[in-house]
Amino acid sequence: MIKARQALSKGMATNELLLAVALSLMIIILGVGLGWEGNKVTPVNPATSAHYNLEPNNRLSFMSNWDGPNYLDIAQNGYANKDEANFFPLYPLTVRFVHTFVKSLLDSGLIVAWLSLVGAVYFYLKIVKQIYHIKDNLEAMRGVLFFILFPTAVFLMATYTEGLFAFLALGAIYYALRKKYIAAGLFAMLSTATHVDGMFVVLLIGMLMLENRVRPLKIAASVAIGTLGLAAFMTWQKIKFNNPLEFITAQKGHSWLNLSDAHFLRLIVSLNGIFVLLLLVSALYWWPRRKSFSIFSLMYASTFFFVGKDLGGLGRYSLVAFPLQLMFYDYFRNKKAIYPLIIALSAILWTFFTLHYAGGYTGG
């Protein structure tokens, strides 16, 4: 048994994929465990619309709340009406494919999310090692902890598009950092078919290429490849709804793009407003260090202009704003007394948001 543990520890220290699997499995077990017992801590939201109700006997149904059931509905029935046109297609398409082999639609959605989480953690490890020239996986893991224990990281393992988007976006960013621009463009292309924020990733790839003084034509080619996912979705929406921008129109029905006079005040007093503040701090932090990371943070901070009255989604979207998490690692990694305290605080906030989500609330 001791030798087996030593072999596993050595394997994780030398193999990024094995470490990614171990970290993902750990966070999934913790998240599901919290949700399983969450009803004893967080009162369940009585609104039936907040929950996935098609598999009442599935004990994991608490992992599919709010937008989660919409993605599963699209996976099963397609885009039956315009109300769901704002949900990007690649995640439900992937769930639909898995559902041909797995009986439960909910389980299919979770399988896609959990496998995507492994991929996202894998690429995050690679990004940390690439940026900081680290060879030790266990040191890189100290940076990844800020990602998997980010307060709203519950969405990486729920039936949301976030897990798949994080995998594809971080893959695109990693390959751009490695100057493998065709691979970066292909990953970015899939990311723009997965999430509305995919274009942020495309723009970041362009900025990283500019920083590396890549020829303009090569930059244009990579950016063009990256936009193909969104272009395909817009083309399909033109055919289906006679409006290539139906995904924007549909957002208004979900309280997006409806700004009111009290919007800024709500931002200040909202928990989600904290994420905007952190993104602005990240932009300031990275400006003298790496301007592309600073601008990427500002892109995500700008989303508060478009979110709805409850400011929902800001924390969730911040998941892929990786310079924000890297800022914490960059600043605290050599502060041995403070680093574990920051990780502990992040874990407490992660627990709060996870219980909140499992109870049928937005959770960020």
Write out the residue ranges for each language-model feature.
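Signature aromatic-anchored transmembrane alpha helix within multi-pass, membrane-resident enzymes
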Residues: 223-227, 334-362
